[in-house]
Amino acid sequence: MAITKEDILEAVGSLTVMELNDLVKAFEEKFGVSAAAVAVAGPAGAGAADAEEKTEFDVVLASAGDQKVGVIKVVRAITGLGLKEAKDIVDGAPKTIKEGVSKAEAEDIQKQLEAAGAKVEIK
């Protein structure tokens, strides 16, 4: 009498995890294969959808522009840093002002800095 698929499935279903692990290793050795999962590429449009759903943004001061003093004041107000720390950020542009903020907050910060004469990027 031949063994059917159902018989094999029933026998495998009754094994413990350790016994299944041993069985898989035996198959790998006997047939020269690996039980590692094969990575399958997703649809091409999936990457674009992930980029649109970004929820956290970084606000980067690209340059201070001509109104450096005004930009320093806005940086101090946004970050809560002291005068020297805010000046160091403005002088060392491009620098990240805020990290991991919502889109609305990032746009608000961008408006404040641009009103003071700075060039800002949201990443």
UniProtKB/Swiss-Prot annotation:
GO MF term set = mRNA binding; structural constituent of ribosome
Q: Which Pfam families does this entry report, sorted A to Z?
A: Ribosomal_L12, Ribosomal_L12_N
Q: Which InterPro entries match?
A: Ribosomal_bL12 (IPR000206), Ribosomal_bL12_C (IPR013823), Ribosomal_bL12_C/ClpS-like (IPR014719), Ribosomal_bL12_oligo (IPR008932), Ribosomal_bL12_oligo_N_sf (IPR036235)
> CDD domains, alphabetically?
Ribosomal_L7_L12
Any one Gene Ontology biological process term? Answer: translation
Listed GO CC annotations: cytosolic large ribosomal subunit
Its keywords, alphabetically, are: Ribonucleoprotein, Ribosomal protein
Keyword Iron-sulfur present in the record's keywords: the answer is no
Against NCBIfam families, the record matches this protein to:
L12
> What role is this protein assigned?
Forms part of the ribosomal stalk which helps the ribosome interact with GTP-bound translation factors. Is thus essential for accurate translation.
**What interactions and quaternary structure are annotated?**
Homodimer. Part of the ribosomal stalk of the 50S ribosomal subunit. Forms a multimeric L10(L12)X complex, where L10 forms an elongated spine to which 2 to 4 L12 dimers bind in a sequential fashion. Binds GTP-bound translation factors.
The name of this protein is Large ribosomal subunit protein bL12
